[in-house]
Design a protein with these regions (language model features):
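Catalytic core of nucleotide-sugar-dependent glycosyltransferases
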Residues: 150, 192-193, 216-224, 229-259, ...
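Conserved nucleotide-sugar donor-binding catalytic segment
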Residues: 140-234
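A conserved acidic beta->alpha catalytic loop
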Residues: 40-49, 69, 93
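Membrane-interface aromatic/basic loop that binds lipid-linked glycans or pyrophosphate carriers
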Residues: 2, 273-337
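Conserved donor NDP-sugar-binding/catalytic core segment of glycosyltransferases
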Residues: 102-137
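Short, well-formed alpha-helical segments that are part of the catalytic scaffolds
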Residues: 14-27
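Glycine-rich, basic loop-to-helix element that forms the pyrophosphate-binding segment
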Residues: 67-84, 106
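Short aromatic/hydrophobic "clamp" motif used to bind/position activated sugar donors
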Residues: 89
């Protein structure tokens, strides 16, 4: 392999942040060579032009793959992996940025000295794009220097807002993911999947130990619309549904069926129901019922009440009015405090 580390950067319509992302990678000081593999997913703004400028400026480091049509995050990510030359893989999204110039150095040293470790990840902070401030991320469930990976799989399956492993902080062995892609590609590239990190994290945890570094190495961008966050109820419904389907398949693959997974799928059914409720959309409600059946989820009491309301149009409309009143009261309270 030509390079020891391949850093994957996926980007789409991120002309305001992609330069920041690439600069944060190029500042890395590491004793092994690295390359940057950019998957530019057919942006409609100036993102591609910026990426081309960086490729021309750093021809020995940056390789740009400009997609002729939009692939979506999952196919774009795994296509970039297949184009990578490194023994180790890292990634950084086109709106996030690394903050520690020794990130790769710290991580590759652990992988070189611990053959049983399949992945190293670190602490990270949230970055508010509106006021340009950084904030500590929530507490992590596994902060020991090294954890046996199989102990983490259930938590990875049932993670919700905070990832057990923030993949943009990670460095992992390419041999494991390349072998898995060659043997069971559909487990990673299913068109219905909503993200790429769940299956990678579970795979690495199933193949060995996971190392953790408490140093903050990433600013995770928040405040704008992303693949995983949208103010549009239909978009958010679709994302949560697809990601939960991934979790269900991972649970089946690793034969994990526990009270924790049951609570998780039950809660996700409730969340989908709430998206349908707020959108006042009966098709979304029908899809929620189907998800509940497919995921074999236990119906929680709050979900029973929600579905009862939504089965009666008058109750549903009344509930929406009541919710709007509460939202306005909360907004007024925030303004007065």
């Amino acid at each position: 392999m030509e390079n020891k580390i391949s850093v994957i950067v996926l980007t789409f319509n991120q002309e305001d942040t992609i330069g920041r992302t690439l600069d944060s990678i190029l500042m890395q000081r590491c004793h092994v060579p690295y390359e940057i593999v950019i998957g530019e997913d057919c942006s409609t703004d100036g993102t591609l032009d910026i990426c081309r400028q960086y490729e021309r400026k750093h021809p020995g480091i940056i390789r740009l793959f400009a997609n002729k049509k939009n692939k979506g995050v999952v196919d774009n990510y795994f296509d970039c992996i297949l184009e990578s030359h490194g023994q180790y893989i890292a990634d950084c999204a086109g709106d996030d940025f690394w903050t520690d110039p020794l990130k790769l150095e710290k991580e590759v040293s652990i992988l070189e000295n611990n053959p049983n470790v399949t992945l190293v990840h670190t602490n990270w902070e949230s970055y508010n794009e509106q006021d340009k401030s950084s904030h500590a991320s929530p507490d992590k469930p596994f902060t020991a220097p090294i954890t046996q990976g199989y102990q983490m799989i259930e938590a990875i399956i049932t993670q919700r807002k905070v990832p057990v492993i923030q993949l943009c902080t990670s460095l992992y062995r390419s041999s494991i993911i390349l072998k898995a892609l060659s043997e069971e590609e559909s487990s990673f590239r299913d068109k219905s999947f909503g993200c790429e990190d769940l299956q990678v994290a579970a795979l690495m945890a199933s193949h060995g130990d996971i190392a953790y570094i408490p140093d903050v190495t990433l600013n995770y961008s928040e405040g704008g619309e992303t693949v995983s966050y949208s103010l549009d109820h239909h978009k958010q419904f679709s994302f949560v549904k697809r990601v939960t389907y991934q979790s269900f398949l991972i649970a089946q693959h690793y034969h994990i069926n526990s009270p924790a997974t049951d609570r998780f799928f039950s809660q996700r059914v409730f969340e989908l129901g709430m998206f349908a409720f707020r959108a006042h959309d009966r098709q979304m409600l029908a899809e929620t019922f189907q998800c509940e059946k497919d995921w074999q989820a236990t119906r929680a009491t709050k979900t029973r009440w929600l579905f009862t309301v939504m089965r009666h149009e008058v109750l549903w409309r009344t509930g929406l009015i009541v919710r709007q009143v509460f939202v306005k009261i909360k907004q007024l309270h925030r303004q007065l405090v």
